[in-house]
């Protein structure tokens, strides 16, 4: 195991919370990178309680709505500031047609979207983003480079209907990136 990619939904409650907490603790003990994808329902259902369980994750990934729901913020910058105050220093915020924002201790950078034609359905685009972002970081790319690759993956995933309409592969990313 090289890393843990976790849906924060697993931390909302029920038996999955204890399993997910065990996975996070094992990852911390082994010093494995952890990427937690927030998910809208998780932030709304668990609120600030969720932050307690996410302490120590390497990267927290979310979209703008999820950021605002989790933090109670009215803007992206306010939400990022609140998460930084809570100790989260590595964030990736998906902002739809505007691309994404990568936040590190060194600062924040807006990553331009990857232009694709025929956007059909954004279902699954966030999952593709998270997978590509985690892969890129694990391969040694910078957070900005990871954000670019993740934007591409999310855009390609949105060119088909449904979460599994377009399963983006590494080969797809290589071809599309040129």
Predicted regions and their residues:
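Ribokinase/PfkB-type carbohydrate-kinase core domain
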Residues: 1-109, 172
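Conserved phosphate-binding/catalytic region of the ribokinase-like
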Residues: 25-29, 74-178
